[in-house]
Amino acid sequence: MEERPSRMFDVLRECGALKVVLPEVDRLWGVPQRPEYHPEVDTGVHLMMVLDMAARLATTLTVRFACLVHDLGKGTTPADMLPRHIGHEQRSAKLLKGLCERLRVPTECRETADVVAREHGNIHRSGELGAAALVRLIERCDGIRKPARFDEILLACECDARGRLGFDEAPYPQRQRLSEALAAVQSVATSVIAARAAESGVTGQKVGEMIHAARVRAVAAWLLTTAAD
């Protein structure tokens, strides 16, 4: 894959092909973002920086696709809201669905990109979250069932954070933090909890609630150890 995929998109834009093939992406150029978060300002420029960062970190096609489409909703932000993009995550997911159906994007790419589009803001802010919110975030990302994909989601978010003017060498502690939080969640012996629940006559949703509570306790205990460090 290309070392600097942005060059291909430059060519596609110059010849007018991008607005035909990927109009959802093409409309991002010229859309301003808040300079305190995005010194590069232009959403299209940011997108190319993210994509080039994904190439620099030698990511998979799945991660690169997620990077390409994570901010589609910013292209439909009402003009009177700019440069803020409130709710762009949900708009991105809706636009992504149509794009994937039109281009017949493989399921793995589509599902990973959908999570990144919906959750990248929450992942960026994960350093502010407590145990319960961290577990809910991991569950929404389906990180417990699909840990390898969860790591790709986190990598795409790192590319997003570092794909900004002046941030290309910045650390992204959120990735390690959420990976460690997932490890704490995975340490919970769910089969033991389910067996004990069955012995007590507890079934159905209550068992799920018990497992969720145990996961929150495990993450809370892990957070205490990180605070001590």
Label for each model-derived stretch:
Residues P147-D229:
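Charged substrate- and nucleic-acid-binding regions of tRNA-handling and nucleotidyl-transfer enzymes
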Residues M1-C157:
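Conserved, hydrophobic alpha-helical core segments of structured domains
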